[in-house]
Amino acid sequence: PNALGILNSALSNGFMAFADKLVPKHPEFVAIATGNTYGSGATMEYVGRNPIDGATIDRFVQLEIPIDEKVEEAMLASVGLEQVVATKWLTAVRKARTNVAESGLKVIVSPRATLNGAKLLRSGSFSMSEVFTATVTKGAKPDQVTKIGAGVTL
């Protein structure tokens, strides 16, 4: 839980203290970190288990890295879902993701929803509507579910 505190100290001081010695930061050292946001980039609205304190946030430059749709498509293809079903599922997830962004909802619709949903659909045990509820709108409040699902064809 105190990993960020240790990292913050190392970034600030330029060295790491170990039991036997101090190790200085390498001249070419670069730290790259990610944070779990609500899927809308560097908004400072993090959903991780431990809040990130201001001093640590201040040590980093924040860049928005959008979901790589080609990677998402490759993840989906790896499941081996029938192409017609895969296309319909991906379209539904992406429409939901757009709805979340446009509505400003604090809901995450990540590529994990695409992958997990495809696996459930491949099993043949669930309808697309059930899978959408289980992977895309899970945990959302009823009014959010309506906004997330607006215009989604299942």
Where are these regions (language model features)?
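C-terminal regulatory/interaction module of P-loop NTP-utilizing enzymes
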Residues: 1-154
